[in-house]
Each structure stands twice: as structure tokens, then as C-alpha cells.
Amino acid sequence: MAGHSKWANIKHRKAAQDAQRGKIFTKLIRELVTAAKLGGGDVNANPRLRTAVDKALSSNMTRDTINRAIERGVGGGDDTNMETKIYEGYGPGGTAVMVECLSDNANRTISQVRPSFTKCGGNLGTEGSVGYLFSKKGLILITSGDEDVIMEAAIEAGADDVQVQEDGSFEVYTAWEELGAVRDGIESAGIKIDNAEVTMIPSTTVELDAETAPKLLKLIDMLEDCDDVQNVYHNGEISDEIAAML
């Protein structure tokens, strides 16, 4: 799990900026619709939908908008015919990049994703080319709290690992299938959770210098600007000193 915290803050800061500009709303609605279509409209019985709802609420989406998206998904129709597709490739500095897309037109999606890699000095790879470097995990972020209390609650709830960050925050890792159960267990202990999501954690990382780091972030920006792209994962490691300059 090395390297995750080095770029997690940049990712989350960017997500907040995107939400302020309204860029992320279309993607959130698309995920809500798809999650409801595949698993039903009950958040208590549909972990993917609950995660999508939590993410939408944290981005200040209204309950009315969320409920309408869920109703669209449950009701079906042509506009809900979305499929998840993962593209793999190499970014600046030899970084491994995985792009999670949700689309009803694979040709349109690849025509957006491939040029982003090319323009940033990377290249789109074949299926499996970098996927083996990542593990699908549940990740729970807790900004602050008593370390002993959080550790005990997380372990009791079934977490795989808890890491204390330099800023005093906590990253709780779970099997991705157990994310909802672990989240519920931690919350039942009275602990405030700031974010919970299924993500891809790199097993090895590539340290980026001051010249390469901005190029990787540019690639991420270009990919996230694509309407069909939901998430971008990478194994680039950016030091605190370089991150402070970005």
C-alpha cells in the first residue's frame, strides 16, 4: 500500500475543486443511475449505491437530485445502459495508470482516453499490462480522532490495516467487499468518517521528480475531463516537498 498517501491529498483536493466547478456532478449522477440499475434502489442492500450516495452528498449534491438519479436507474431505459470498462497504460516517468470508465459507447470512450496518454508522453497499454500492480481495496478516511479508539473500532469492525498519517489523519483499509460493514462498525463507535470508497492501491510506486510530477497531474486532468472517465488510479509517488509546489 506504499505511496498512496503521497498523492491521496492531491487527488482529494482536486476532487473538491472539480465539485465546486460542477464538473463532477455528471459523473456522480451516472454512477448513481448505474448502481441503482444493477443493484436496486435500497442503499442498505446495495453497497455500490451507498458509496455513490455518500460521495454525492460530500460533493454537496442535493437529496432531490440523488433520488431522481436513483429513480432513473431503478426504472431502466435506454439512458441507463452503461458498462464499466478499465483501460490500462503508462504515464510520464513510467508510471502505471488505470482508467475506470462508465460508458454506453466504447468507441467514443477510447477516442477520448487514448489521445490523453499520447499528448502527455504516455501510451495506452493492453488489458493486464499494469493491472497486476494494483489491488482493489476499500479505503476509509478519518481526519482526526483518538488513535487507540480508532484502531480498536477499525479492528473490531474487520479492517485489514490502519495507517496513521503525518498530519494526524487515518487511512483504514478493508477488503473491498467488506467496505460497507467496516464503515458501519466504525460509525457505530461514534467515529466520524470523512470518506469511504472502493479504490485501487498500487503495490509498488514510482517516485516522480519536480519535472515529471506536473506531467502526470496533467494526464490525470485530461483523463478526468473526459465525460466517460469516472476514476483515475496511478502508482506515482510525489514527495511532500514537490506536492507543495504543485
Swiss-Prot record:
Its main location: cytoplasm. Keywords: Cytoplasm, DNA-binding, Transcription, Transcription regulation. The keyword DNA-binding applies. GO terms for biological process: regulation of DNA-templated transcription. The keyword Ubl conjugation does not apply. Transmembrane segments: none annotated. One of its GO terms (cellular component) is cytosol. It is found in: Cytoplasm. One of its GO terms (molecular function) is DNA binding. It holds the Pfam family TACO1_YebC_N. InterPro entries: Integrase-like_N, TACO1_YebC-like_2nd/3rd_dom, TACO1_YebC_N, Transcrip_reg_TACO1-like, Transcrip_reg_TACO1-like_dom3, YebC-like. This is Probable transcriptional regulatory protein PM0980. It comes from Pasteurella multocida (strain Pm70).
